[in-house]
Amino acid sequence: METQIHQLEQEAYTAVLRAFKAQSDAISWEKESLITELRKELRVSDDEHRELLSRVNKDDTIQRIRDWRQGGASQITRHATIQPFDVLPSPTFSAARKKQKTFPSYNPSIGATGNRSFNNRLVSSGISGNESAEALIGRKVWTKWPEDNHFYEAIITQYNADEGRHALVYDIHAANETWEWVDLKEIPPEDIRWDGEESGVALNIGHGSASFRGNRRGQIHGGRGRGPRIHQPRRELVPPPTQQNGSGGRRTSSDDIELFNTDSLVKEVERVFDSTHPDPLELDKAKKMLKEHEQALIAAIARLADTSDGEMDGDPPYSHDHPMPQG
């Protein structure tokens, strides 16, 4: 009976794909969000999706409609912002939006970006030229995530001129900080709001953190190009036991050992490796984090060994008057 139920679920999902394909070879953000939810509710896996989509593409009726459309028949454009339909077979990852390395510093240049007329031009016609794009650094922006229809606040911190993408940082400077590279021209005007913009639209502001949204994105597989991102665990400063040195001084902050939170690191790496279709970029980041953590542990052990040798040479033993910091 369970097999029959799942067959009905696949038939329903296929019917929706055929209907969307019949309408257009392109898909709007709204349709993509709907398909994402259907995949979850109808229990359609990534492999099943690819197989069903392949069947739809080979369907004789769909092919006739496609030929008719390409033959010059009038086509009603239902949505202004669309993307190729065939990106859906692997919705888990997208080159458009992936979390990158932590930015070492954040120095917003608000004064250079407070031009509201430029802001309006950006939303309606995109960015023209590197100078205008870089002027957005430091701006506050809200973007809508299709899966919950909420807007989330981010700060634009960098611009990659080669790829034409801006870095959006959510929960900046917080322990759960997350970020993504975005081509702002790909975001529909109704899905983005700018600080100071008098749009007359009441924002449905989300109260969840960006890290929660990143994890949720990884679970439902899809949405507006945001793939599951590897969330770099927070580093913790672990001071060695305090000791008196030869001149009676205490240790300095340079004596602290900086390590990733091991539990968080292991969980994050497991999440990346356990995904159905791991992203090579995310795998590479996970390997680099593990290697960095390994090197930090080796360095910490070496420093502890040096300190222990100092005790054997006659230095006073450690005093334990400084508690370990709570993560």
From Swiss-Prot:
This is Protein EMSY-LIKE 1. Keywords: Coiled coil, Nucleus, Phosphoprotein, Plant defense. Disulfide bonds: none annotated. The lineage of its organism: Eukaryota, Viridiplantae, Streptophyta, Embryophyta, Tracheophyta. One of its GO terms (cellular component) is nucleus. Pfam families: ENT. Disruption phenotype: Reduced resistance to Hyaloperonospora arabidopsidis isolate Hiks1. Slight early flowering phenotype. SUPFAM superfamilies: ENT-like (SSF158639), Tudor/PWWP/MBT (SSF63748). Residues 214-232 have a biased composition (Basic residues). It comes from Arabidopsis thaliana (Mouse-ear cress). Isoform 1 interacts with EDM2 in nucleus.
